[in-house]
Amino acid sequence: MKILLIGYGAMNQRVARLAEEKGHEIVGVIENTPKATTPYQQYQHIADVKDADVAIDFSNPNLLFPLLDEEFHLPLVVATTGEKEKLLNKLDELSQNIPVFFSANMSYGVHALTKILAAAVPLLDDFDIELTEAHHNKKVDAPSGTLEKLYDVIVSLKENVTPVYDRHELNEKRQPQDIGIHSIRGGTIVGEHEVLFAGTDETIQITHRAQSKDIFANGAIQAAERLVNKPNGFYTFDNL
């Protein structure tokens, strides 16, 4: 499989290493600013790359969105999470002409976590729910896109849910519809996501811990391996 990388930060550098270990070929990289240290052919536009089978994006909205407005016909795996609503609308539009895969978290374990959560929420309807995520001290956005995904699962199953981000400003007891959302930043934490169900005299915790960023890179590669054989459409872990 011949892969075009959109962005060449820490994550796509991992994609390149792991993809080549699997026998795939990196045919080029698209970056905001060409760099002499990038060990692959650099391009400005997706359509300029003639021999790629798929593009894998681990970049940011500033790089990705202008590319999506261009005309190209390359299967696309997207891991950028910024400006999610705008991004999903654009990817849905593109999926009429190319196969597109999107996930806010490329770990299949996190996908499994969302399924476990969907099963637990109706069973624990009278339990309070708190969501916590922890990441390294260089992560700039909070809460994480994955935590937002977990929150969306809860919203789809419970009515009148209220997100609570900063409880120290509230001078009132917890309300039944509250969903606490907490972010921790420190050290080199790869990524941890926890759902706490707190009931009377008992608690249940569901946790996913990433032990290496390789899980996200491998997830993107595995998605690409499947996507290249798919017809045009919008794909997630649910239908890939």
UniProtKB/Swiss-Prot annotation:
The active site is at H135, K139. It is an enzyme of class 1 (oxidoreductase). NAD(+) binds at A79, T80, T81, S103, A104, N105, M106. Gene3D superfamilies: Dihydrodipicolinate Reductase, domain 2, NAD(P)-binding Rossmann-like Domain. It comes from the Bacteria. Keywords: Amino-acid biosynthesis, Cytoplasm, Diaminopimelate biosynthesis, Lysine biosynthesis, NAD, NADP, Oxidoreductase. Its main location: cytoplasm. GO terms for molecular function: 4-hydroxy-tetrahydrodipicolinate reductase; NAD binding; NADP binding; oxidoreductase activity, acting on CH or CH2 groups, NAD or NADP as acceptor. One of its GO terms (cellular component) is cytosol. (S)-2,3,4,5-tetrahydrodipicolinate binds at H136, G145, T146. CDD domains: DHDPR_N. Its EC number is 1.17.1.8. HAMAP family: DapB. Catalyzes the conversion of 4-hydroxy-tetrahydrodipicolinate (HTPA) to tetrahydrodipicolinate. This is 4-hydroxy-tetrahydrodipicolinate reductase. It comes from Staphylococcus aureus (strain JH9). The lineage of its organism: Bacteria, Bacillati, Bacillota, Bacilli, Bacillales. The gene is dapB.
